[in-house]
């Protein structure tokens, strides 16, 4: 079921569309009219691939958490492990006779945030490689992008948000 599709983006050559759905990242081949998953471990309130969790969406101001390389052969993407983040529950008031509770991961001050990893997926080989983002598992990993010459750039910032680095690497 791909009904909750979001954050769609064309590849540089315009032949492929990447998108997130069901907490997984997918590729749609326009010419072949076929969809293939890049990730399969996405699960509600546990793992998010290719799009951000609540903290990143609200506090870091972005949702699309992947980027095509300039040659369109690779995709860098963020993977959010929310398993340690506490669940927050609120009532949905949507006009029904009985309201339903909506549960989602929502860290309050001092609670655990998602553990974020950066991966690079090779469209030709289908292989995925984890990028070393440093030893601080509680840091923010922001805005994965590619330079015109094919190097991967991302930003990292500690949770106190008083130390920021731009990192350039060759995955």
What is the role of each PLM region?
Residues 1-65:
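Asp-box/WD-like beta-propeller blade repeats and closely related beta-sheet repeat scaffolds
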Residues 11-13, 69, 147:
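Structural WD40 beta-propeller signal
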Residues 14-18, 72-75, 150-154:
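Hydrophobic beta-strand positions that form the internal "hydrophobic ladder"
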Residues 30-33, 122-126, 170-171:
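Short loop/turn segments that connect beta-strands within beta-propeller blades
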Residues 38-66, 77-130:
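Predominantly five- to eight-bladed beta-propeller fold
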Residues 122-158:
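Long hydrophobic segments that form regular secondary structure
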């Amino acid at each position: 079921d791909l009904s909750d599709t979001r954050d769609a983006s064309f590849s540089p050559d315009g032949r492929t569309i990447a998108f997130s759905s069901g907490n997984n990242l997918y590729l749609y081949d326009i010419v072949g009219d076929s969809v293939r998953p890049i990730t399969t471990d996405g699960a509600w309130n546990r793992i998010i691939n290719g799009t951000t969790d609540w903290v990143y969406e609200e506090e870091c101001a972005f949702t699309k958490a992947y980027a095509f390389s300039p040659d369109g052969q690779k995709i860098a993407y963020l993977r959010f492990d929310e398993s340690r983040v506490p669940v927050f529950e609120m009532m949905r008031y949507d006009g029904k006779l009985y309201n339903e509770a909506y549960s989602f991961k929502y860290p309050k001050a001092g609670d655990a945030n998602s553990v974020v990893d950066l991966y690079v997926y090779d469209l030709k080989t289908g292989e995925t490689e984890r990028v070393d983002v440093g030893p601080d598992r509680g840091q923010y990993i922001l805005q994965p992008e590619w330079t015109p010459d094919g190097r991967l750039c991302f930003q990292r910032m500690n949770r106190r948000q008083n130390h920021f680095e731009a990192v350039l690497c060759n995955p």
